[in-house]
């Protein structure tokens, strides 16, 4: 992390977070914790939501299971408004059951977001952590929008249960595609209000979830995964991208998916990277 943060110095408020109120899910570890730390250093009042207690950077720590809408609603009520930025960083990895992954990564975050929207200040920002695993959302747009337009958490659960061909063995990527589709759909709807929705699609990042990805995909897959910059990302590198996305300075950017993958998708989309080489032989 930057020297300024390590020393605990108060940074110049270039990004205009001083005196604002931010909500961060997954604030106990990984990208969420790094985001909370940066926001606090920038002068924001940070409220963390996690299944574990959040660290010292947060003003308020709320124990929330994102598959439980009652817990989500209670946390939103406790935090109250106005809210200036929402960072949806929590998530389950590929080793978790597919339905649980869909409910936490997509349905729970959607429920939280919709609960927070009425409390948002003018020009507020909402940023989701998606993944390069969700890059195919446009190719599957019809399917993803069908899920996105389900009316609420329970309806999303029913949709997932009725579509095992979509989420079976692919819950993680399906959840990330749904996030990107929701950001595009809802971001477009909310654009006239000034509320901004964007997603960040990280490549491999050294968070506490990485061992779970290695367990499900295999060490060889990640050893061979193309890294144009030569390494995995650090959590704070992804956190800074999220903070930039939600900054009031970023007032014209909405309904879009952004990639923080060290050049991976650039190589993939232009032929410099052949993912077929990573696939196990049939």
Please describe what each predicted stretch is.
Residues 4-5, 9-14, 254-282:
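Short C-terminal tail/terminal secondary-structure segment
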Residues 56-70:
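Rossmann-fold cofactor-recognition segment
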Residues 12-46:
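Canonical Rossmann dinucleotide-binding motif of NAD(H)/NADP(H)-dependent dehydrogenases/reductases
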Residues 201-212:
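Short, flexible catalytic-loop segment of classical short-chain dehydrogenase/reductase
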Residues 118, 188-189, 251:
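Alpha-helical segment proximal to the catalytic Tyr-Lys
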Residues 191, 196, 253-255:
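Short, small/polar-rich loop/turn modules that mediate ligand/substrate recognition or access, typified
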Residues 93-94, 99, 125-192, 204:
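Catalytic loop of short-chain dehydrogenase/reductase
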Residues 111, 164, 168-172, 177-180, ...:
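C-terminal helical subdomain
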